[in-house]
Amino acid sequence: MVLPSFFSVLIAIKVIHNQALDNPFVILYHYYMDTNFKTLIQFTTYFKDEQTCQAYFEQIRFKDGEYCVHCGHTKINRFKDGKRFRCAKCKKDFTIKTKTVFGESKLPLQTWFVAMYLLSTSNKGISSIQLAKQIGVTQKTAWFMDMRIRKSMKQNKGQLFGIVEADETYVGGKEKNKHWDKRTKGTRGRSTETKAPVMGLIQRGGEVRANVVDDVKMRTVEQQIVNHVKIGSNLYTDDFLSYSRIGKLYPHEVVKHGMGQYVRAGNIHSNSIESFWALFKRGYHGVYHHMSKKHLQ
């Protein structure tokens, strides 16, 4: 799941080149950490025109010196227009946007920058219709930009560690507003007939991992935890049966929600991941209304 599509999550990208080059949130990392813009007015005042945006992106992309984005050669020549480059070795032309999320787009960098700001600072996310209105493009174009930005915000593959909370939730599947003869039977509880189950893990004071899964059976839940949580970490969950064997692999503490227990002595709880779900669902119901399983992940 591409979480920042729905939440204001600060992504601290520490690698500025190589694999991070096509990630537009390299830029967001820089403005959050270095310039720390507090408002959209401050942001647009700083990035006031296309020339400023281009110079800023060049500074980031060519941090360690100019190079050809096709072959990596360090001898390149700039055209008189200041926007295009040609490699002295492979003779290929390119712009500062080539092989980035901005590539193949005729939209100005300034438009992309503002879109990224809006998407990353909206707590509950922003719909493509609203984004289109705010940056002056069509809904189709805003959707295209939104999807590119979301894909660039893929989750870190590193494992969580320390104190990790686990929980599962379901997205979609509301049948109450349908006519009785169009309702799918057997959708209550943990049924996945019309709902998408999502497994979530959050490191206390750290990152989140959330993935759409086929079910929340014991084997599936255990596999998700092993994939994303470092062995030796302390795992906190509720009393859902699928977590009952995980104590063989991790120090495991349980909060018995079924008995009205939500916090145990020693700050043992799963409130962090549950708060995450609450924020997610406010964005889902209030902004997106419906989401296919494909776009949920």
Where are each of the predicted segments found?
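Residue-level recognition of single "structural anchor" positions
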Residues: 6, 10-297
